[in-house]
Amino acid sequence: MPLNEIFVHALNPPFFWLKIFKHLEKFLKNNVDCSAQLINNKNSKILSNTANLLVVDKTKKRVNEYIEQSSKDFNIPTKLNGVDLPSLNDVIDDCISKIDNKSHVFGVLHGDLCFSNILYDTRSDRIKVIDPRGIDAEGNFSYLGDLRYDLAKINHSVIGLYDHIVSGAYDLTESNDLNFEFEIFIDERITKIQKIYLENMKLSHLAPFNLMPETILLFLSML
């Protein structure tokens, strides 16, 4: 069963999800280890550049397209649940400035490691991934990349609650331009699962919190 269905609709306890996160951590580690001999100074520079294209350039492109279609002004301050926030352009610039371009983790990249592309086999107690990207940000066939992107995609599901949003488990009201009331419907169990994830998940020397700028940009790239 896909993890997004389990996460949103099932009632599996936090200790089940700790096991899932350990499977994912092992999967990412294996993807780094099995490709270590393929990474060199030449292709690491290429991979570094394509990683930047995949996160930063794609976000800017998608946001600009959205602005043209919606006539929204991304330069004005926003408000969420009564809290004054910076403009969305300021948020984008801040996230880009906080990406650590020296902390790449190169390996075999899935490229879309969201919960809907991860299956859990209860009989074998294994995860199985489907629908890998297989191309880089420029459209070239490649299975190598920066695995920080894969971890950010998992963040997207666990911390960003992307699958809850897609399933309609939220309430959103826009009272005026970029002034929102927003609630995602979760229980205390999900909050505990998020805490376990943040405390236990690792990619090399990185924790999920280190990838929050990329995670935010992933959401903005989906506008």
PLM regions: where:
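Conserved kinase catalytic-core helix
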Residues: I6-Y66, S70-D73, P86-S103, L109
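Active-site acidic catalytic loop and adjacent metal/ATP-binding pocket
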Residues: D93-G145
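Active-site activation/catalytic loop segments of kinase-like enzymes and analogous catalytic loops
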Residues: I127, I135-M201, I216-L223
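Conserved short submotifs of the Hanks-type protein kinase catalytic core
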Residues: M1-N4
